[in-house]
Amino acid sequence: MVSRGIYRRMGLVALVVGLGLAGGCGDSEPAGRVGDECTPFAAYLGHEGAKVTLYTSITDVLADKLQRSWEKFSECTGITIDYEGSTDFEKQLVERVGAGRPPDLTVFPQPGLLASMARKGALKPATEQVATNTDKWWSADWKRYGTVDGKFYAAPFTANVKSFVWYSPKLFTSKGYTVPSSWDEMIALSDKIAASGVKPWCAGIMSGEATGWPVTDWLEDVLLRTAGAEVYDKWIAHEVAFDDPRIRAALDRVGEILKNPKYVNGGFGDVRSIAKTGFQEGGQPILDHKCAMHRQASFYASQWPNGVKIAEDGDIYAFYLPPIDSTKGKPILGAGEFLGAFSDEPAVGAVTAYLSTPEWVNSVFRLGGIVSANTGSDKTLLQTPIDRLSAGLLTDPDVTFRFDGSDMMPPAVGVGSFWRGMTEWINGKPTPAVLSKIESSWPD
């Protein structure tokens, strides 16, 4: 429901900001009146004084940017958006929904959790306007992740690209290396760098209870490039077994890099050092030219030290992880969030409608650090080269986008046996044994 009282929050790391201002768009105009600056929000008027609660896992700097992105909307419509970001998001959301006190809106980082809430009957289907906006401004690949059992529930929100390889343009220029456009070229480049006495790759997969997740991304990326999107989709749905020969072949292909002592682990040690290196530190030896390449998502940009120039002519940049089989197209592995509603109050509908438009996405782009796959957005507003590269790939009509597979699987596998299995694999356990163990963990 739309909250009009004081919402008590306990046991959370939370950011709560009410963004509706009593003064509206100007000193002489009450909230909800259309002035020159408020004309773009005319379609969302009629809800003055309403409060809409929004719950998310997004905290810190990005949370501040999101709240700033809809300030003008709140000023002009009189709708207060109470933002709460939590580091214990999934557990708390399940508890709140179970207790009958869900937030009005939730930003879901995992389609699997979204689907669970929809199947419980807790989520409301998306409004007609949100569905229209999504059909117009996002690809069908993106819409399908907000759709559960044929019914559309949640519009795409923000996005990131996982199919990136970080490198040093300065090192490449000084050594005469060129960015590879195919997998074979990338392997040939790796051999050339290894022959020079430098380990071409560096990696780290340690991440507390989530240790191992970076290898799941490697496997997913390679599977898309070898077996294709159709097999990938069936694998996620367990219509293709975890120990299927195609999955084994993809993981062995990953091993040609991550388990190759000639290739890894630049700046850290041998193959097994990968499991003892934090994912945040995994690519840092590139800065000292102790390794040349690091496969990691676009969000790794935030891990580089202050003062590092991230650009094609800078200290650090990224290139698209190249294809293996040209018949499989141009696959992109990525992730993102989806905005779902637990309330069908009109003010909630107004907020979800606005947050599914290019106009809102453009306001986020102006603040920097957040990317969207919205095809109607103005990418010239993006603040950094890596954001522009990411958005360009996400909105490329020739790209086949697929969501992070582990986020789509049952939690017992996707955030459990899959992570653990990849860690065991890095530490020397054979591919068949690892994949068979994960397969046996899939819930009935």
How would you name each of these model-derived features?
Residues 293-299, 305-371:
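Extracytoplasmic/periplasmic substrate-recognition and gating elements
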Residues 143, 365-417:
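Long, aromatic- and glycine/proline-rich binding clefts that accommodate carbohydrate-like moieties
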Residues 37-46, 111-163, 193, 214:
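Hinge/lid segment of periplasmic solute-binding proteins
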Residues 207, 229-307:
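Extracytoplasmic ligand-binding clamshell segments of periplasmic binding protein
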Residues 44-46, 127-139, 205-209, 224-249, ...:
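Short, solvent-exposed loop/beta-turn-alpha elements that line the ligand-binding surface or hinge
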Residues 117-121, 142-179, 184-187, 205-235, ...:
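Periplasmic solute-binding protein
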Residues 72-140, 144, 170-181, 284-285, ...:
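Extracytoplasmic "Venus flytrap"/periplasmic binding protein-like
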Residues 173, 395-444:
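Conserved C-terminal helix/tail region of periplasmic/extracytoplasmic solute-binding proteins
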